[in-house]
Design a protein with these regions (language model features):
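Surface-exposed, charge/polar-rich loops and edge strands
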Residues: 1-73, 79-276
Length: 276
């Protein structure tokens, strides 16, 4: 029998009971389920983002409907209603117009969103985000120069949006702001300010196009990168499969090295001349 084979039979894997290998084995046993759970979590994120992306796609593809078919005073815009294209007929109330601070355009320039009440034929008010304008200066302490909205009776079209909240947006609703400036577009707060029946949520105007391209209309909503979460899930599961494979490879290498070292010692002892 070859010395190496003989040594394997004598329990060369007993080193697995050493402190170092026990710790390594425990770490491997902890890593495997942890990585599997992380993969499952990433897959759930992928499914959630895919579902939200589908809602956006469905909403943008839906036919325009009158705004009062989807919202009313006190109504909370749902995720299925968000981004739906709606139409409304009425007139802009520029006197009660406000600007929303610290908003960026497509080039990440900081400025304002222009929020103009739109009075419907039945007297209710729809909040219309007419788009982005640049800031007059870094302080944003004075009311900026805002392009006038169309006068008289007009029909507007836009994407329905839910009211903004600090919890959902992370934007703090600061107090003591300069006159006619706000931080959040919230229909309940605007209803109190205007003392009017304000439809829940607001719309991001898409038509008519403003004269001179200002305010700058808001672009289509972007979609979340769901594929990235899918890739992360697969990555974590591959890592979890690699752990036991790596453990076996390391253990076999250690056993082989130990067996070869022991065999070398045995051959050396046999080669020594007998004492006279």
């Amino acid at each position: 029998m070859h010395p190496t084979t003989e040594l394997y039979g004598r329990g060369v894997y007993r080193f697995l009971m050493s402190r170092q290998w026990v710790i390594l084995t425990l770490i491997a046993l902890l890593l495997i389920p942890t990585m599997i759970r992380l993969g499952i979590w990433q897959m759930h994120r992928y499914e959630e983002r895919t579902a939200r992306n589908q809602l956006v796609t469905d909403a943008l593809a839906a036919e325009p409907v009158p705004v009062e078919k989807l919202t009313a005073p006190g109504h909370t815009v749902t995720s299925a209603e968000r981004y739906r294209t709606v139409t409304a007929k009425g007139r802009f109330d520029a006197e009660d117009e406000v600007v929303v601070r610290r908003r960026t355009n497509s080039d990440d320039e900081v400025g304002y969103h222009v929020l103009t009440p739109f009075v419907l034929d039945d007297g209710k008010v729809l909040l219309v985000n007419r788009g982005w304008i640049p800031s007059d200066g870094p302080s944003q302490t004075t009311f900026p120069k805002v392009p006038a909205p169309p006068s008289g009776e007009v029909t507007v079209e836009g994407r329905l949006m839910p009211s903004e909240t600090t919890a959902a947006s992370g934007i703090k609703n600061l107090k003591g702001l300069p006159d006619r400036q706000i931080m959040l577009i919230n229909s309940e707060q605007e209803a109190r300010r205007l003392d009017a029946r304000v439809l829940g949520g607001y719309i991001a105007q898409t038509a008519p196009e403003p004269k001179g391209d200002t305010p700058e209309l808001l672009g289509d909503p972007g979609k979340e990168d769901a594929a990235l979460n899918y890739a992360y899930a697969v990555q974590w599961w591959l890592f979890s499969a690699a752990v036991p494979v790596g453990w076996v490879v390391l253990a076999r290498r250690e056993a082989r090295d130990r067996a070869q070292a022991a065999a070398g010692e045995a051959d050396a002892s046999k080669a020594e001349p007998a004492a006279v």
